């Protein structure tokens, strides 16, 4: 039996219950013939959702004797913006709200929403997509809501992995093995990830202006959970605390000799088609926001998620929001406030165990005070790189610096430690705060009305801010690197250079060629990365085999790739 998807609508009480069911072409029975029970959708004190009478409830249920082990699922809006990060390997009956802040999504009735499914083909085998989902939907009572399956737009070379075995039938159950995160990543990133997708479109002509969307997934297979609201579980510890767990092995290494997972345009997860564009950006104004957003959004997980998945370098760009002047992260379009990014860092780096213990009764006990200090922050080294700050005035630079110092009080390492700083020297102040204010010199006007030839140094008296040009090398040419082949060719030369005792970034970044209009309008940065990134993984595997040093590996959509596994392996084995 194949997978089955069910969408249900809970209407007003004066309407008949409607059920829209997608059935398999090979079976005559639906997943569930019963109407959604009140137990499923009623308010519950323990629920993180509030479900009102007029809310739209959308359920996706899986029932099948599938041989398939792994799924990747994401929710998109009609502009193909990822609303939230990928959900990997759901446990049976787990529920999740697609929102970075763990709150309800307020549905825009003017938009369609899509769910994309990626399948892993373990056998390098495929079946016709018509066997994967039935495209005939039964709509009771002629309700105005409808589901449309956009299967005609699927690429002709689409291949999906087998979802069934003809030797088994509906009632034959399988025992699926429990797998570790390492094994999951190994399976997914052995270049078997199929980059094509099935798109299920659902649309609701709501009588209210605001609806809540809730997604529920279930499956006979109890899957290991890689993404969830709760990041404190056992299986996240190897990523969330990977430096702490391997402290004895890495503490005497210089930070610039570590392999560190990095995030490009790290906080662009908030960009969507309705986001404002940054004034003066180079993107032509005639290109609609629905297209610009697809290429401006480089991450789908928030900073806390990225930290939890082991990422330790963050590329952060700041500009003032129009009218309000509030400091925001940007990449052609405005994303989220800087304060949100800093709050996520604080949330992650603070050691909650410290705050659960009583204070020492003897303030003169230096040993006890040292133990408490050791417990204050996690021993996870983080590099923040504030750059592309050309939109900020002197006053806004000062505002940003004050916010960073205030939010990250006590966590910032002094730049006097230098670029040869060792991991153990950052045990109590784990954040290296790299700041680039070079753009200021272009706008400083002297008394004679001429631009200053001397750079304005806004961090001269700020020892907790490391100079970008003295601390970091991050070379890239956005005018040339339009294919993975171009980037890898450049990186192959870059790894052989002497980076003059600085941290250095290997930018595994693809830049779209503005001349390829068809590619721009029909694709997105996310889909492009999924198709090209296995080549980057192969490149770094070759570096590992030859023991070629590398430092920061920076990627788009970083939580989708196994760079943390790679970093841990190299840091503890070399």
Curated annotation (Swiss-Prot):
Cystine residue pairs:
none
Give the compositionally biased regions (Low complexity). Answer: 21-34
Under the heading PANTHER family, the entry gives: PTHR13593, SI:DKEY-266F7.9 (PTHR13593:SF113)
State the Gene Ontology BP annotations.
lipid metabolic process
Coiled-coil regions in this chain? Answer: none
Q: Where are the transmembrane segments?
A: none
Q: List, alphabetically, the Gene3D superfamilies matched.
A: Phosphatidylinositol (PI) phosphodiesterase
Q: What is this protein called?
A: PI-PLC X domain-containing protein DDB_G0269228
Domain (PI-PLC X-box): residue spans on this chain: 270-449
InterPro entries noted in UniProt: PI-PLC_domain (IPR051057), PLC-like_Pdiesterase_TIM-brl (IPR017946)
Q: Which GO terms describe its molecular function?
A: phosphoric diester hydrolase activity
- Region (Disordered) residue spans: 1-42
Give the top-rank taxon of the lineage listed in the UniProt record for this protein.
Answer: Eukaryota
């Amino acid at each position: 039996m194949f997978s089955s998807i069910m969408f249900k609508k809970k209407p007003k009480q004066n309407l008949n219950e409607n059920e829209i069911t997608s059935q398999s072409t090979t079976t005559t029975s639906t997943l569930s013939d019963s109407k959604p029970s009140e137990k499923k959708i009623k308010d519950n004190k323990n629920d993180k959702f509030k479900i009102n009478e007029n809310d739209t409830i959308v359920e996706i249920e899986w029932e099948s004797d599938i041989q398939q082990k792994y799924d990747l699922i994401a929710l998109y809006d009609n502009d193909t913006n990822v609303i939230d990060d990928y959900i990997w390997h759901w446990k049976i009956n787990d529920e999740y709200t697609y929102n970075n802040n763990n709150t309800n999504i307020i549905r825009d009735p003017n938009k369609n929403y899509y769910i994309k499914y990626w399948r892993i083909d373990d056998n390098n085998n495929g079946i016709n997509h018509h066997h994967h989902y039935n495209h005939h939907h039964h709509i009771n009572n002629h309700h105005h809501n409808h589901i449309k399956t956009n299967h005609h737009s699927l690429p002709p070379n689409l291949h999906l992995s087998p979802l069934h075995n003809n030797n088994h039938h509906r009632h034959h159950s399988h025992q699926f093995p429990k797998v570790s995160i390492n094994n999951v990543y190994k399976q997914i990133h052995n270049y078997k990830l199929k980059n094509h997708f099935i798109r299920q479109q659902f649309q609701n002509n709501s009588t209210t202006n605001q609806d809540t969307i809730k997604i529920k997934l279930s499956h006979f297979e109890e899957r290991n959970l890689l993404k969830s609201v709760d990041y404190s579980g056992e299986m996240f510890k190897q990523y969330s605390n990977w430096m702490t767990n391997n402290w004895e092995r890495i503490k005497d290494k210089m930070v610039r000799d570590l392999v560190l997972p990095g995030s490009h345009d790290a906080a662009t997860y908030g960009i969507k088609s309705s986001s404002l564009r940054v004034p003066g950006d180079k993107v032509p104004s005639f290109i609609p926001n629905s297209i610009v957003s697809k290429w401006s959004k480089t991450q789908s997980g928030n900073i806390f998620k990225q930290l939890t998945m082991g990422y330790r370098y963050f590329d952060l760009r700041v500009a003032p929001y129009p009218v309000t002047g509030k400091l925001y992260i940007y990449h052609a379009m405005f994303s989220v406030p800087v304060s949100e990014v800093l709050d996520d860092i604080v949330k992650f780096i603070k050691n909650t165990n410290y705050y659960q213990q009583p204070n020492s009764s003897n303030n003169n006990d230096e040993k006890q005070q040292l133990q408490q200090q050791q417990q204050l922050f996690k021993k996870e080294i983080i590099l923040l790189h504030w750059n592309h700050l050309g939109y900020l005035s002197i006053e806004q630079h000062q505002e940003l610096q004050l916010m960073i110092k205030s939010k990250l009080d006590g966590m910032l390492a002094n730049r006097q430690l230098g670029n040869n700083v060792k991991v153990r020297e950052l045990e109590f102040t784990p954040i290296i705060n790299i700041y680039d204010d070079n753009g200021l010199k272009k706008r400083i006007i002297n008394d004679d009305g001429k631009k200053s030839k001397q750079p304005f140094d806004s961090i001269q008296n700020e020892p907790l801010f490391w100079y970008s040009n003295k601390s970091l090398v991050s070379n890239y040419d956005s005018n040339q690197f339009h294919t993975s082949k171009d980037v890898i060719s450049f990186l192959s030369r870059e790894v052989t250079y002497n980076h003059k005792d600085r941290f250095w970034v290997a930018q595994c970044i693809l830049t779209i060629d503005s001349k390829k209009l068809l590619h721009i309008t029909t694709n997105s940065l996310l889909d492009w990365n999924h198709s090209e990134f296995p080549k980057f993984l192969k490149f770094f595997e070759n570096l590992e085999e030859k023991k070629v040093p590398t430092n920061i590996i920076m990627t788009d959509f970083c939580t989708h790739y196994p760079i943390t596994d790679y970093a841990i392996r190299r840091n503890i084995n070399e």
